[in-house]
Regions:
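Transmembrane alpha-helix interface/packing and boundary motifs in multi-pass membrane proteins
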Residues: 216-222, 305-314, 345-357, 582-597, ...
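Hydrophobic alpha-helical transmembrane segments
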Residues: 208-209, 227-231, 261-262, 296-304, ...
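Membrane-embedded alpha-helical segments and adjacent helix-loop junctions characteristic
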Residues: 246-338, 534-612, 617
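Flexible hinge motifs at transmembrane-helix junctions and intramembrane kinks/re-entrant loops
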Residues: 214-234, 406-409, 472-476, 483-508, ...
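Structural signature of hydrophobic alpha-helical transmembrane segments
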Residues: 197-209, 256-269, 311, 315-319, ...
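Interfacial loop-to-helix junctions that mark the boundaries of transmembrane helices
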Residues: 42-50, 195-202, 220-226, 249-260, ...
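Beta-strand-enriched, solvent-exposed domains that form extended recognition/catalytic surfaces
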Residues: 65-196
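Juxtamembrane and boundary regions of transmembrane helices in multi-pass small-molecule transporters
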Residues: 2-79, 170-185, 335-338, 342, ...
Length: 689
């Protein structure tokens, strides 16, 4: 065992009282106490006052707008039926000279998006024109918008277009919408008329500033992450209000994907109840037992256990329940605790990539209605992700072993002092522990598949004493609830069997089943351990992303991306789009939480699919690989990383941003190369869409 010649300044261990909810409430400032204390008191005071003034100014502006600007009225709606070879007129007032018309009905959405592929046969044509009061003289008219009708008369799709009329109504002139039939059968369409649509140019700038503001607040940790998302989402609504498009409360709530929140809430409930049984501590001790106390076999089994549990019980939850016992295990074996915890965080992120419930990004993607409509379910998701995740995990562990084979045993003076302090606090072993030690020593060495470490009997007996399964009946109930959930997910993957058993509902009902079986009269204890701020953070991001979408940001980005893609050969467009989405998501995740990146990039994926002939599924897989593997790039990439760092800080171990980055970022690049190769082979070579 080596001692570093220049050990870092000691960090005192602090107790974090209350429920586990407080782990997320703590900001990343706690992780950077050293940097904060280097600032003078005067500088910190100036920064604090400046921050308060900006936030108060923002609050005042939002409050004023909310009070002054009422929620927008719904667009004018009308049902239009046109007989064969006839034209129908609808009068419209155009105060701003622009109107957005949406048509709902049996329209061919694809051919209207890509008119170069149609055969010139249109069902109707629509234009906006300025005419006289007798409707027989046209002073100005827009270009004809040709409507391609769907061969399926029961289809109900929506297409939209903005029209600008340079000459408005007045005097003998009036603006009308003309719908002309071009087929031998009647045409019936539901028409929505919005005479005050958003103009894209300035709106895109506002949207860009909103996203930049959110990134700055989170990256520089100006305020709590959840509050940052809430205040920026509120600002987005205020901007829409200034533009006379403020949504009402019902519309705002409809922007939230409650299916993903139900999934995360249910998993949090199940895992926190399971944690009271002691099963997670028992499993960590089990990894020590099967590794016979040998350091690298232990790290391998612990990494695989973390990845497996993260896949099915969520990486954030596993970070909460596995970190404390892992710290104790590292101290018992004299391993460099911070290194082991970073490795654990990396495998939690990679394991979480395997299933829809493995981490928040996967939950956000797989519960989206458009993704579900593409046939993405539990079994389908696991089958697509499994090869890439397995290869990445084994390659990463090999690299970790080669690069940190010796450094994992190099302890700094601070860890030595902590270990010495806690060694002195230990109580003498009980008689039961002594008997267990004697039993382990008497076991024939030949019965071990791996030669035990020198202090293996004493360490194992000490770990077993305080880390047993405390409530076996409750553990059985937890297994029943989980079995119900996974059975329903598998059945949902079979066509026409349990079609309504979506991920969110299944996990939520499994949580309710566990609460019923647990039979506790007081539900407060269960609700207190739910990480409500994570759920609120994600809900605020849903609202913000929808507001940014309404401001035209994703459409603007999509148009420019399509301009680039059209310069490529058609057979290369899917591959380039997939790689672009994969690496952009991963690199953004280095600086901001992967859940936030996922919500924005998912919107971008839909825009790309609507503007170019690119299948959606490859973009879903690219997004999930990029968000999950990209979370390994830095301490801020995933919530689970921060949770591990904060729990480590409780126990006296500091994992700095730089410490995590040095280990995690190169490994992230390796996993991204693996993910890129896998996606190119699967979707470009094999066309596995």
């Amino acid at each position: 065992m080596k001692i570093l010649s220049n050990p870092p300044r000691p960090i005192s261990s602090r107790y974090l009282g209350g429920s586990r909810l407080q782990v997320w409430r703590r900001t990343r400032t706690d992780v950077h106490d050293d940097e904060v204390h280097r600032l003078s008191d005067r500088s910190r005071k100036i920064i604090h006052i400046t921050k308060m003034c900006i936030l108060l100014l923002l609050w005042f502006a939002c409050t004023f707008i909310v009070f002054v600007f009422a929620a927008e009225e719904k667009p004018r709606s009308t049902m239009v039926t046109v007989m064969p070879n006839k034209t129908v007129f609808r009068k419209v007032d155009l105060p701003n000279g622009v109107v957005r018309i949406s048509l709902l009905g049996p329209v061919d959405w694809y051919l209207m998006r890509f008119p170069e592929e149609d055969n010139g046969e249109y069902g109707a044509g629509l234009r906006v024109e300025c005419v006289n009061s007798d409707l027989n003289v046209s002073y100005h008219r827009s270009d004809m918008w040709n409507i391609v009708m769907n061969s399926d008369s029961t289809a109900y799709l929506e297409v939209s277009r903005n029209f600008i009329l340079h000459e408005g109504s007045g005097g003998d002139r009036q603006a009308v919408i003309s719908l002309e039939s071009k087929q031998d059968s009647p045409v019936s369409l539901h028409m929505l008329i919005n005479t005050n649509p958003l103009i894209t140019n300035m709106c895109v700038l506002y949207a860009g500033l909103l996203i930049l503001g959110l990134y700055m607040l989170i990256i520089f940790d100006v305020i709590d992450h959840t509050f940052a998302a809430l205040i920026i989402a509120t600002t987005a609504i205020a901007i829409l209000g200034l533009l006379e498009h403020r949504p009402n409360v019902h519309t705002i709530i409809s922007h939230v994907n409650f299916e993903s929140l139900m999934l995360l809430f249910g998993l949090m409930t199940i895992v926190d109840i399971m944690a009271t049984t002691g099963v997670f501590e028992y499993l960590v001790v089990w990894t020590y037992r099967i590794s016979r106390g040998r350091p690298w076999p232990l790290i391998f089994f612990l990494s695989m256990l973390t990845a497996f549990l993260s896949a099915f019980l969520n990486s954030d939850n596993m970070a909460l329940v596995l970190t404390p016992i892992t710290i104790r295990l590292c101290e018992e074996m004299s391993l460099r605790t911070a290194y082991v915890l970073v490795i654990m965080a990396i495998f939690a992120d990679m394991g979480g990539a395997l299933t829809p419930m493995g981490n928040p990004p996967n939950a956000i993607v797989t519960t989206n209605p458009a993704v579900v409509a593409e046939g993405v379910d539990f079994v389908n998701f696991v089958i697509h992700m499994l090869p890439g995740v397995l290869v990445a995990m084994f390659v990463v562990f090999g690299i970790v072993y080669v690069t940190h084979r010796k450094s994992i045993f190099v302890l700094d003076q601070h860890q030595l002092d902590l270990m010495k302090e806690r060694e002195g606090e230990k109580a003498p072993p009980s008689q039961e522990t002594q008997d267990r030690i004697a039993q382990l020593k008497d076991k024939e060495p030949g019965r071990y598949w791996l030669k035990p470490a020198e202090n293996y009997p004493e360490t194992l007996a000490g770990l077993e004493e305080g880390n047993r399964i405390r409530d076996k009946p409750l553990l059985i109930k937890c297994c029943i609830a989980l079995s119900f959930a996974f059975l329903c997910m598998i059945l949902h993957s079979i066509p026409k069997v349990a079609d309504g058993a979506t991920l969110g509902w299944v996990v939520l009902l499994a949580a309710f089943l566990l609460i019923i079986l647990d039979d506790k009269s007081d539900l407060n204890a269960t609700l207190e351990i739910i990480q409500w701020t994570i759920l609120l953070f994600i809900a605020a991001l849903f609202v913000l992303s929808e507001a940014v979408d309404q401001l035209g940001f994703f459409e603007w980005i999509g148009d420019r991306t399509v301009m680039f893609l059209t310069s490529l050969e058609p057979q290369h467009q899917t591959a380039v789009t997939t790689m672009l989405l994969l690496w952009t998501t991963a690199l953004l995740t280095v600086f901001i939480d992967n859940a936030a990146v996922t919500i924005f990039m998912l919107k971008f994926s839909f825009q790309m699919a609507s503007k170019d002939d690119i299948p959606l599924p490859p973009m879903f897989w690219a997004l999930t690989f990029g968000a999950c593997f990209g979370g390994n790039g830095s301490l801020f990439g995933a919530v689970s990383n921060e949770i591990i760092a904060l729990i480590a800080l409780q126990h006296g171990y500091k994992i700095s941003f730089w410490h995590f980055f040095v280990i995690g970022f190169p490994l992230m690049l390796v996993t991204m190369v693996i993910g890129s190769a896998y996606l190119l082979i699967a979707h470009s070579v094999l066309s596995w869409n």
